Amino acid sequence: MNAENTFSILNTNEPNAGGSQVTESEIEEEDIEFLSFAALKIGATSSLSNSSLGLPEYSNLFAINNLKSLFVAGVPNYLIIGSTLDLQKSLIDADENVDANVLKDSASIRHVSLPDAKFSMVSFSSNGEFVIAYDFVSFELSVYETDALLKNSATSIYKAVFPDLVQVLPNPEINNLVILRNLKLEVFLLSLSKFQVESPLAKDATCAAWSRRGKQCVIGFNNGTMSQYTPAGEIKLRIPRPPSLENYFVECISWIENREFVVFYSPLTSLSNESDEPPHESECFVISVGMNGHFNFGKAGDPTPPFGAVNRRDHHYIASLHAWKPDLRSLVVVANTASADLGVLALSMEKNQWSILNIVDETKRASLPYSNKKDSDSSPTALVMDFTATDRISKPLDPTEAPADCSPLPIVWVFNDEFQLVAYRIFYADAISKSIDYPEMNVIKDKNKDSTVRASNNENIPTPDKQASPFVKNLSSTSSPFSQSSAFGNFKFGQATSFDKGLSTDASSGAKSNTPVFGQPSTFGQAPVFGQPSAFGQAPVFGQPSAFGQSSFSFGTSNMNQKLDFGTFKSPLSGAATGEAKTNLEKAVTSASGKASFTGFAPSQSTTSGLNFDSIPKDNEAASIFGSSQVSTKNTSGFQFSNNTLLADNVDEDIESDHDTKIEELANSDVEPSTEQNIGGDVSWGASTFQSKPQPSFSFGLTLDDKSNTPGKNFSIFGKTAETQVEQKKPENNVLTKPFSFAPSDKSMFAANIPSAGEGLDQQKTSKALPSTGITKLSENDNEKAEESNETKGFNTTIAKQNDKSSKSEGKASVANMSALNKSTNNETSDSKPSLKSPLFNFSADAPTFTFNKPSETPPFSFNKPLVEKESKQDVSDTSDRSPFSFKAFGIDSKKSPTPEPTEMAESNISEESEGWKLIEQPNVESEIEDQDEESSDLNGKRRSTPPKIHEVGVNKMLDVVPKEKRDLNSFFPKQPLVVQSTDKNKKEPQESLEDEILSAEGFSEVEAANKISRFEPFSSPKLKLATSDNAPEKYVFEESESSDLEEGPVPLRNLESLADLPEAESNEKLPMVNTFERLYLQFKNELDLVWQNINIIAEYIEGQTSTPSAVSEQATMAMLSQNTEELEDLLDTVTSFSAFCSDYSKQIDYLEACLVRINAKRIQVTRLLKALTNPAFEKQMELRQLGPEALRRQKELRLKMEKVLKSLSTLEQQAVDARMSDTRRFKKPTLGSIEVAYSRIATLLGQRLKQLYKLEKDIKRMATKKKMITKKSMSSDMMTQFRALGISQSSTKQVSAHYLREFERQDAFRNGVFKRLTSLKKAD
């Protein structure tokens, strides 16, 4: 990057001048309940056509213009246009659980007939004045006036042939600019003002998208890369492909924010795949472009997995919401041609990170309507956001929860391939509970303004006047811009075309208008020469009052009321006008460097007669820091720069959110951007490390209230600044820098956050500072003065010898006059000499420093968490040794070389009894009662082995400065039983009377004294005694002998097992896929158990290290300060590293647990899939299964079918009843069972009758053989009976035979009829 220009990375002539760094991360899935979708009418859809026409994958057949509250839909043979409010009402009033409610024609909804039209794309222009439609059969692109369509007029104002268009994308702001993309992977720009197309803007392009303001477009290519273009064809930025993808093309792009893109990639093989089952392997990435050319690819997989109409190739539809407080910075809704559900991505304001939202309640998700015709899922052909709703919603959250109602909510419309519409309201619970409306809903309410409204920041963008509309050409003429050449063939980029010859006839009279011709400079509102008045309004010279509301800047002004055409379009934040109308400042910069640099990133605008896209506002014209644009009186733009910040040229200023605005303000800052509200203001030194809040780990002297980071001013421990030199002296004796703090070296680390009582005494005593450690070194003269005046400096300085009487009297006096002395001490100046009775610490309620009877809320060396809330910025150079948080307050000084040697040692005062005495219940900060020349104990309470030495401190003097209620050291410092009693049982207690006197004076009992201060006592005495010699009756006599039996070794660290040594898991499942998932699940579980085992071992080791008692074998001295500091810093680094390690491990464990849950769910899913593949019945059940309102509708349909079946069975039963098989006289209606019984009986009777006939036949044949006439006499009585039963009279044999045959046939026919009837009844049953 150019060191002279920090914005060299943004140089438009070198899109990748700064290089690029590419990283890839994973976007996590989040289960949420704060967001939900609710249908306008559960189970209701609106049908716009009953056609079954097949549509291409790249269809977009529904659009909404929120400014005009209009919708348009393309269906076979019709364009349907009307009011969105009536469309919402028609769906709310529709019938439930009906295949589709037909949208009827009305006064506000028109079905414009267009015979043989088969549309694949429809859309509005940015201001809603025109409707653009494309017929994928005839390849005709048609433009209609919206007003004409509302009057049911099918006359187009423009029509041209464009073969194989797959994308028609109007500019969201510029009303007459449209992107066209065809199957040849070419991208063109169509100007609706001239109906002309230039040479391809880009080739090998697979998708395109406008920025939210339409100043730039981004084009994706078949190699996976993307590029940002201006409408003039200038490349602003090149975006590489994700590192993990190869042989993928850019399938869909949505430009969400300035530097945020949601992009879908698909395999290259799907471009040429024409099979019925194309591959569905799309990948979703959220691309974040950093200020320094860094690209981060957040992988989100595919939020809309292919569980739907899988016969269609992947094509995604994206709609988004922005800046919905309190936490939704961006909400992206995604639909996929191969998915039946909608996916959701969100960017959080608080976390500043993307996530895939998984709505926990399945009934609150959004899905496409089910296709009853095909008995399968439908596929989307459009996804649109609607901000025009006006009805308030009652009980939006829950019938029992507040609020009772809420403002209208955004609506997302989904149009499927069966021309059915379904709509869902988007409920954001956090915003509803706080009564926060979606901002664009409020903007639409004010849409009656004459200018285009910017939804996200209420900017007013001027739109072309109706009289200056280019669509006034008499289209009845046979001449057409496309009559002489093809739309795509014979143009060269930059070649002079009819594009420059504007249509300037008036709409009503056909007269020539004054609207400037596209590509020619406009004299009206032209930028004047610097220092000269403008042509309109006579803007005065800088500093004089402006005329006609003009800016006081005399250059670069523009007229907000000017009627503009496409070629002369200006944003209210734009700079110079089109063509040659450039500011002198920009010309000067351009001519000096030969190319635009720093203030003019774009190249010089050409004055040729070709297609002049330079007239479109550039990004760097959005907000000129030099005042080259006239800004409206109420500037609502989110981009406001300080004097030392510049706008990046390659950034499209489409985002008005606070976050990105403040990132822009920090473009020239060394501090990393943050989402907090204090960005761009006073940024403290810790902001780059801890983002929103500075978090120095152990800097006790810093406060967030003090923000004067002024060189040359240092901060004292008393909260006041002291003028010092900017350059600090080099630390003496190689003292380590920043031993306990992550703060800069000029910040104090051990300064008190509250002024102490000795502030007045030490304010003028400026000593040489050790700037990195916060240790104050006293000069020898200062020590001599302190020694002469017997002035005590905390608990760390050597106290001069005092006689018995003076010490006792001073102790009693100091206890009696403590509060009075505190007040007098606070008022003293450095010139006054403190008295001997003046205490060093202020224990009053007004200015507390040390509190010994209550644990501190944040101990000085707490490793739990750093102090971040109540720290004050202090400088070390003014740190006095009287500060209770300085090292001297703990009896610790720097190395021996800068510290004056003590003038007297008390080795001669060692009594004969000293060898038998040891310390009991000694607090871990022993330096409070030790001489500064002796070795102090470690901060963790351990002691090192050193030769026995004498420690002498005036007891009465020590007790004098500590009030009664503050003398409990045990509540502040943990006790450690480090001593035992002496073995000499015959020794007397020479100081018993002294001890009793002290205890009685202070009101302590002997037991209480054992808990308050350190004592010396022989083995034989049950009391705590003070042991002294005759020579030093008022000194503690102490000797510590080495005791090896007290030392306990630290708890050893057990060996940790490695994940690499973990054996592979095995599964007993037989199915291969289930076996694989089972092994993966078990492997994760074993690894997780091993990780927990290792963590427990480490925790046990740490607990053992902190709780293992050990004897102090060596006494610390002030000379060991540097070593102790280094050890403490190393320990701090270790603890910090371990804390970070534990945090990382915890995150990994949480991630593993989440993975286990997902694997378990995936296992169940795979099991179901295998079952579905092997069980046709289960597969049918899965096809019938739908979620949410769709399931209710289908369930009702199933119930209706069941009712029909039952009704049919009832009808059949009625028909069987009507058969009336017997007892016709009483009209008895037999049942099926009774009929079967009757049939059995009839069959039995027929069998008996048949036997009788056979017997009769046999007798007749026997009689006939005798050739005799059968007479009455020749017949037996049985035969006569049979004849009578059969109704046969006496006749000849022939007559008998004929009658027999007729009777037999009749009975056989009757039996066959009954049998057939029963058979039919059984089949019906």
From Swiss-Prot:
Please indicate which superkingdom the organism of origin belongs to.
Answer: Eukaryota
Q: Which GO terms describe its biological process?
A: protein import into nucleus; ribosomal subunit export from nucleus; RNA export from nucleus
Q: Which GO terms describe its cellular component?
A: cytoplasm; nuclear envelope; nuclear periphery; nuclear pore; nuclear pore central transport channel; nuclear pore cytoplasmic filaments; nucleus
Bias regions of kind Basic and acidic residues — which residues? 779-791, 802-811, 867-881
Is Cytoplasm there in the keyword field? yes
**Polar residues bias locations:** 763-778, 792-801, 816-835, 850-861
Looking up SUPFAM superfamilies in the UniProt record yields:
Nucleoporin domain
Under the GO molecular function aspect, what terms does this record hold? Answer: nuclear localization sequence binding; structural constituent of nuclear pore
Phosphoserine: which positions carry it?
S1041, S1043, S1044
The reply on keyword Transport is yes
Q: What keywords were assigned to this record?
A: Cytoplasm, Nucleus, Phosphoprotein, Transport
Sequence ranges of Acidic residues compositional bias: 927-937
The record's Pfam families line, in alphabetical order, gives: Beta-prop_NUP159_NUP214
Briefly state the protein's biological role.
Functions as a component of the nuclear pore complex (NPC). NPC components, collectively referred to as nucleoporins (NUPs), can play the role of both NPC structural components and of docking or interaction partners for transiently associated nuclear transport factors. Active directional transport is assured by both, a Phe-Gly (FG) repeat affinity gradient for these transport factors across the NPC and a transport cofactor concentration gradient across the nuclear envelope.
Name used for this protein in its record: Nucleoporin nup146
